[in-house]
């Protein structure tokens, strides 16, 4: 026993003397302390971060090396051969693949090269260099797998542009702020635009100047983070600096002289107590309307709204001679925004830190519906319009149409309060997060055309209609509680586990009566009382994450998670990943396989935008969207919504064959089962069960369902070669791309769903199958130059029955639609539209006038490249149509609303239709 005790003592003595404690301070090359610098013992998971004063303390093995990394700075490696090691980091060289990332693992932090998952890291400098006005648009020109688009005349969609990663819609990317879940928007996209039927967080609300970096995990991560992480995770890391600040004044204008932009942003920091910090950002911006209408085709208008005769064309031409664009306003809306954000933290003991962040955003957007021309509803048919809209002229002195406006007020807030502590090597993080989004709407210059009589027999609307309406709105709120615990058990094993509780609330606010009564406000009817209400649910999740470094080169990682929802039950998902390095870490092989889930949002379950009306002889008719829990949905055979389930596989490699050069290539394959989809509007009739009752007619309605299974596969490529000495300056190249191999439905349509060619296009084919970004930057002296080229590949859009065939009976006669003079047409499409591949070039020049003053000029879309599409024949009948100019014009009128949207159809595009824009900013540091 005595010998064992002696051996035990000697063993522990060796361990103690084989380790050493290293302390120091990390500063930048101006001598300013840097908080949050990552220090990792090379070849291990052992790491710490610098405190508010740039100081650190770490225990490492004797003879170890320390790697110091910070976003936007060169990484530095130092041999731990002293008890105090002070380090100065230089901004030259910017980010690299050795940056430590916090996304993708619930155990130890790892660098980009040691993580088994594909992660993009975008610094604040990268974002601002794009010259884009908002965070989401900056990502569009930095991340090939990220797409966002602005669509014209789309009501509430104008408040929040849809975005997506890997063409999987906004609902399947989880947004985090400092690692905590951000609230969803209250907006449900219901228009014919990308993202239809989905919702996502409002990332455009986050001020760019508040962001230190963005980590984008391009891999399924439901096992670590829960619902919504099927396509990936975007973690927005906020700035922590407190010793300096800056103010930026931004201005911009398009090459056509509209869309004027003016903004000012302040980012600053201060100390709180001895070692606490507070960083804050205040941002105000105003963007004016930019209008890109087309010249309207008179014959198409006469055919659609009149009888198509020469007299009808003359009537239309009288108006178009004065207003060739039919007074339509479509482009980018008028927007004003105010954004406030804070991020802070303070130590409350030797091993416990308090942290917090909060943000509030207010945004007002003013857009327009299609202009109601006088020949749409002639004064002879509705004489009251002259009293409401007396805007005539000499040729038509009484009435000249009206243009409804759509005005939206959006507010978004989020906040987190938490504690992090370290005790006996156990890291504990406990937090509470709240967040919400509210949108209310106003419709002006419109009318309720319904013939509804009051008790005295007078018209309630029509000639007595108001011209301003409050259609109501929506709100979404959540409360999230998290407890995350992790520990590095040894040089080889680290674990993480935790729990999350989340409560969600969705509200549909009733509009004023005039906005919904009868047909409601023209252009945008309000929320009916029976469609309004408040709904909520809660869920609890637990997870376990284990990482095992079998050797310093070979890592395996596994995670499992179970969530229980109050409305649909439980879901269990898992993930396994691995990474292997060789050739002195020059080559890294990595891969992962995982299952995931996405719970249908409360918006998708409970949204109902329907109009009920009685039609003599036909009973009650319902049109619009019926919600998933309505009796009508059950009668139509629509099942209760269930979570989407996914299986994701990613395989790739990274290489650093020589200094300053890196490349990563990752293949992904994502299968989604029971995809939640908003189907097409369709005409439905529910037979009455009682012969004494009338059938219930479910008119032009759409509804959500688990409609089909899908598969998306592709390749992500990221490469960079930086710090190349050219003369007295430094040159850098970055090339990244996303190639989609497969993005399609792989099952039959389920649950009595309707899924047309249009929906198939919006879901699968209307986004670029290929997107590449080539960036070149050169810095010399006080000047910096950047040239960014973004290649948007081809995409296609199939309209339902575009140039379809007329239906004939057995005798070869044309079949008429009952009660109409129109001819029935089949569902075939002889033509489709194809958006042509385009390269958009952005040029940036910045001048460091002094150490504190920087002037930057960005010319976005330098060569004024505009979206362009063409017809493509699907068959011989389509080819014959393309040979007939008159037929081509007719079909073109169908998808551009008689050329109103000649630049950008309702089908969407992939970059701005505004053309060249000029942006000038002045930044002053203090």
Indicate where each model-derived feature is located:
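C-terminal beta-signal and adjacent terminal beta-strands/loops
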Residues: 7, 185, 788-818, 847-926
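Short, acidic, small-residue-rich periplasmic hinge/interaction motif at the N-terminus
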Residues: 27-32, 37-42, 65-74, 82-128, ...
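Short acidic/polar hinge/loop motifs at secondary-structure boundaries
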Residues: 56-58, 180-218
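Extracytoplasmic beta-strand/coil segments of soluble accessory domains associated
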Residues: 57-59, 140-185
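N-terminal periplasmic accessory domains that precede
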Residues: 83-90, 137-138, 142, 163, ...
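Transmembrane beta-barrel wall of Gram-negative outer-membrane proteins
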Residues: 243, 256-369, 374-381, 385-386, ...
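Outer-membrane beta-barrel transmembrane domain signature of Gram-negative proteins
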Residues: 394-396, 402-417, 421, 434, ...
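Gram-negative outer-membrane beta-barrel transporters
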Residues: 662, 667-801, 925
């Amino acid at each position: 026993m005595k010998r064992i005790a002696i051996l035990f003592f000697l063993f522990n003595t060796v361990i103690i003397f084989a380790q050493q404690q290293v302390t120091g301070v990390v500063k930048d090359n101006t001598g300013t302390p840097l908080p949050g610098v990552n220090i990792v013992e090379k070849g291990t998971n052992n790491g710490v971060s610098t405190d508010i004063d740039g100081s650190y303390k770490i225990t490492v093995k004797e003879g170890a090396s320390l790697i110091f990394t910070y976003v936007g700075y060169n990484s530095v490696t130092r041999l731990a051969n002293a008890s105090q090691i002070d380090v100065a980091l230089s901004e030259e060289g910017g980010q690299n693949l050795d940056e430590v990332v916090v996304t993708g693992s619930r155990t130890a932090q790892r660098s980009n090269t040691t993580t088994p998952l594909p992660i993009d890291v975008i610094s604040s400098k990268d974002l601002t260099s794009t010259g884009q006005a908002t965070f989401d648009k900056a990502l569009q020109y930095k991340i090939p797998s990220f797409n966002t688009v602005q669509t014209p005349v789309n009501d509430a969609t104008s408040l929040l542009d849809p975005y997506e990663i890997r063409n999987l819609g906004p609902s399947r990317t989880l947004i985090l702020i400092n690692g905590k879940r951000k609230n969803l928007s209250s907006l449900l996209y219901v228009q014919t635009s990308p993202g239809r039927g989905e919702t996502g967080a409002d990332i455009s609300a986050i001020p760019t100047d508040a962001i230190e970096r963005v980590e984008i995990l391009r891999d399924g991560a439901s096992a670590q983070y829960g619902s919504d992480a099927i396509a990936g995770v975007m973690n927005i890391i906020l700035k922590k600096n407190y010793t300096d600040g800056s103010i930026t004044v931004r201005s911009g204008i398009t090459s056509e002289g509209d869309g004027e932009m003016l903004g000012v942003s302040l980012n600053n920091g201060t100390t709180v107590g001895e070692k606490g910090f507070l960083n804050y950002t205040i941002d105000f911006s105003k963007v004016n309307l930019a209008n890109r209408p087309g010249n309207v085709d008179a014959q198409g208008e006469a055919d659609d709204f009149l009888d198509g005769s020469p007299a009808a064309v003359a009537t239309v031409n009288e108006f178009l001679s004065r207003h060739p664009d039919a007074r339509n306003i479509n482009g980018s809306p008028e927007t004003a925004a105010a954004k406030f954000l804070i991020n802070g933290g303070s130590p409350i003991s030797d091993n416990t830190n308090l942290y917090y962040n909060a943000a509030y955003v207010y945004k007002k957007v003013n857009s327009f519906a299609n202009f109601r021309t006088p020949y749409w509803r002639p004064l002879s048919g509705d004489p009251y319009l002259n009293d409401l809209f007396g805007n005539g002229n000499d040729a038509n002195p009484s009435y000249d149409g009206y243009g409804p406006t759509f005005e939206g007020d959006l507010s978004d807030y989020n906040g987190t309060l938490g504690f992090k502590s370290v005790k006996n090597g156990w890291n504990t993080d406990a937090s509470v997060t709240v967040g919400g989004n509210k949108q209310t709407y106003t419709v002006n210059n419109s009318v309720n055309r319904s013939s509804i009589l009051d008790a005295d027999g007078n018209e309630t609307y029509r000639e007595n209609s108001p011209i301003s309406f409050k259609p109501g709105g929506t709100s979404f709120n959540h409360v999230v509680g998290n407890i995350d615990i992790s520990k590095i058990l040894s040089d080889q094993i680290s674990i993480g586990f935790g729990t999350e509780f989340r409560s969600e609330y969705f509200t549909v606010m009733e509009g004023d009566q005039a906005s919904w009564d009868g047909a409601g406000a023209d252009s945008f009817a309000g929320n009916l009382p029976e469609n309004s209400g408040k709904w909520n649910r809660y869920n609890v999740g637990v997870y376990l994450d284990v990482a095992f470094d079998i050797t310093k080169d070979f890592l395996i990682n596994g995670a499992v998670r179970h969530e229980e929802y109050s409305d649909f039950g439980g879901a269990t998902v898992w993930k396994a990943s691995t990474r292997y390095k060789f050739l002195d870490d020059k080559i890294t092989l990595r891969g992962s396989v995982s299952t995931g889930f996405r719970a249908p949002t409360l918006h998708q379950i409970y949204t109902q935008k329907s109009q009920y009306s009685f039609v003599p002889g036909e009973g009650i008719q319902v049109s619009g969207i019926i919600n998933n829990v309505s009796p009508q949905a059950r009668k139509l055979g629509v099942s209760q919504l269930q979570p989407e389930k996914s299986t994701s596989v990613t395989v790739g490699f990274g290489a650093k064959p020589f200094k300053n050069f890196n490349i990563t290539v990752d293949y992904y394959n994502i299968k989604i089962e029971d995809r939640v989809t908003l189907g097409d509007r369709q005409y439905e009739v529910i037979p009455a069960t009682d012969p004494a009752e009338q059938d219930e007619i479910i008119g032009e309605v759409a509804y959500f369902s688990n409609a089909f299974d899908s598969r998306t596969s592709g390749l992500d490529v990221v490469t960079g070669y930086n710090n190349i000495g050219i003369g007295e300056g430094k040159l850098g190249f970055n090339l990244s791309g996303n190639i989609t191999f497969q993005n399609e439905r792989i099952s039959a349509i389920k649950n009595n769903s309707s899924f047309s060619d249009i929906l198939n296009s919006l879901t699968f084919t209307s986004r670029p199958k290929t997107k590449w970004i080539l960036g070149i930057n050169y810095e010399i002296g006080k000047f910096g130059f950047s040239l960014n080229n973004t290649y948007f590949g081809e995409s296609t859009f199939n309209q339902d029955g575009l140039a379809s065939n007329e239906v004939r009976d057995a005798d070869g006669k044309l079949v008429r639609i009952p009660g109409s003079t129109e001819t029935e047409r089949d569902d075939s499409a002889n033509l489709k539209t194809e958006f042509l591949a385009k390269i958009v070039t952005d040029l940036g020049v910045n001048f460091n006038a002094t150490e504190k003053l920087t002037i930057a000029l960005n010319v976005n879309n330098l060569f004024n490249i505009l979206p362009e599409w063409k017809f493509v024949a699907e068959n011989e009948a389509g080819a014959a149509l393309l040979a007939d100019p008159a037929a081509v014009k007719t079909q073109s009128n169908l998808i551009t609303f008689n050329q109103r949207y000649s630049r950008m159809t309702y089908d969407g595009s992939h970059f701005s239709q505004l053309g060249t824009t000029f942006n000038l900013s002045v930044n002053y540091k203090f």
